């Protein structure tokens, strides 16, 4: 593991390209509705029940990382949160992702999940969270 000397984030690869920002998690959560905050913390707690997951605020999103980054909160709406799970293959046979898109020029498929209620973290979503975690901790 490599630790950035400027921001103290840890990465699998030395000199990993990233944005050293002074953003804090509170910068993203400030001014959000109680409902949105409850959704965010429920998602974070659900991931932490799976394994040791760190939360990394970046310039424009909130990353969740095991050994590598395994999920991203890309938007905190008024009554929802948008989450992306990056996988190396597309998992089309599901009911939870409203969009699956390949990142151009890569073998990464972003799986988009919109969470409106705490109950949206159902068994299917938990199975993808567990998969993301397992892939993250076993990455090279």
Enumerate the predicted regions with their spans:
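Charge-dense, helix-prone N-terminal extensions
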Residues: 1-140
